[in-house]
Regions:
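Short hydrophobic alpha-helices and adjacent helix-cap/hinge residues
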Residues: 2, 20-253
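Bacterial N-terminal signal peptides
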Residues: 7-17
Length: 253
């Protein structure tokens, strides 16, 4: 994906200018990352973006902004994103690059017009909204959908004696989309595992005590496998049940 992603950026800048001569222009690029500056791999993403543009012969000033998603409410995220867009507008930004679902989702739902006026390149989108892409011809990039059929199958094969799969979520839009994807996958493969069942637990809709009792204590956790379609702060607890997820953010907890 990395081999394809950064040539795509160079191509977009070439289309914008009609030529790709670094001596003629320096482009202003806004890179919006979904989580905090302290997330371990974020500096690597910024470095790779810089290297990719440099290899493509593009001279660019890259400004990296951090949304700090999962810490703020969605309304607060939108406020932060509007501030990010206003700063980008003042810098006369030529291109926006986003990393992961939260950055792109908030960018397109914050109410600012900037993402509709200049090219946007997305990366790491696990739950793409095709309707958004259809009405935004200025958006391009790559998605990285999770194959939950494979993830669920691996979870059951690794822990065959654990018969209860718990899909853990909160009430956020992306988390609920992840739950739907897990449920659809389970419908496809559950006939292979007739002794297993999948149940959904929402940490914002159900008593935390009951959830903690189910998956955090040895005397109950032995029969559970936790499926986390989207990483949530609750999962930073010391769970006794194994957790299967597809987000790099899980590796920081």
């Amino acid at each position: 994906m990395k081999r394809l992603f950064f040539p795509l950026l160079a191509g977009l800048l070439w289309l914008m200018s009609g030529t790709l001569s670094a001596t003629e222009r320096t482009y202003n690029v806004l890179f919006i990352q979904s989580y905090t500056k302290n997330t371990p791999w974020h500096s690597l993403l910024t470095e790779n973006l810089e290297n990719g543009l440099d290899k493509g012969g593009v001279k660019a000033n890259i400004t990296t902004e951090y949304l700090n998603a999962d810490y703020w409410s969605f309304a607060s995220e939108c406020f932060i994103m509007r501030r990010i867009c206003e700063r980008a507008r003042q810098r006369k930004t030529d291109l926006i690059v986003t990393s992961s679902d939260e950055a792109f989702f908030t960018l397109t739902h914050c109410g600012d017009s900037l993402p509709y006026q200049i090219p946007v390149v997305v990366s790491g989108i696990k739950y793409p909204d095709e309707r958004v892409f259809e009405r935004m011809p200025n958006v391009s990039g790559y998605v990285s959908k999770t194959d939950f059929d494979v993830l669920l199958d691996a979870a059951v094969r690794m822990f065959p004696s654990r018969r209860e799969l718990v899909c853990l979520s909160d009430s956020s839009f992306l988390s609920l989309k992840g739950v739907k994807a897990v449920e659809e996958s389970w419908e496809r493969i559950k006939s292979n595992y007739p002794e297993h069942e999948l149940k959904v637990l929402n940490v914002q809709a159900k008593s935390l005590n009951s959830i903690i009792t189910s998956i955090c204590y040895d005397y109950n956790a032995y029969k559970h496998i936790v499926i986390a379609p989207k990483w949530i702060p609750f999962l930073s607890l010391k769970l006794k049940a194994p957790v299967f997820t597809s987000q790099n953010l899980a590796m920081t907890n």
